[in-house]
Amino acid sequence: MDDATPAEVIEVLKRTGMTGEVMQVKCRILDGRDKGRILTRNVMGPIREGDILMLLDTIREAKEIRTP
């Protein structure tokens, strides 16, 4: 994982997916070209504020979840 970029989860927004297994989070890039940038990403599995994600791609951003 030499090319992965660390990002800290700063806020857990919503749950999504068929059974709520995916969480949408806001995370701050900690290192690299986009240091300090805040992204919205979809994450599978248990996650909470303060966790560190290793992102392979810092360009993609998740779309906002719309509820009817």
From Swiss-Prot:
Keywords associated with the record: Ribonucleoprotein, Ribosomal protein
GO molecular function: structural constituent of ribosome
GO CC terms of this entry: cytosolic small ribosomal subunit
SUPFAM superfamilies: Nucleic acid-binding proteins
GO term, biological process aspect, one: maturation of SSU-rRNA
One matching Pfam family: Ribosomal_S28e
Entries under PANTHER family matching the protein: 40S RIBOSOMAL PROTEIN S28 (PTHR10769), SMALL RIBOSOMAL SUBUNIT PROTEIN ES28 (PTHR10769:SF3)
Family under the similarity heading: Belongs to the eukaryotic ribosomal protein eS28 family.
Protein name (database record): Small ribosomal subunit protein eS28
Native source species: Methanothermobacter thermautotrophicus (strain ATCC 29096 / DSM 1053 / JCM 10044 / NBRC 100330 / Delta H)
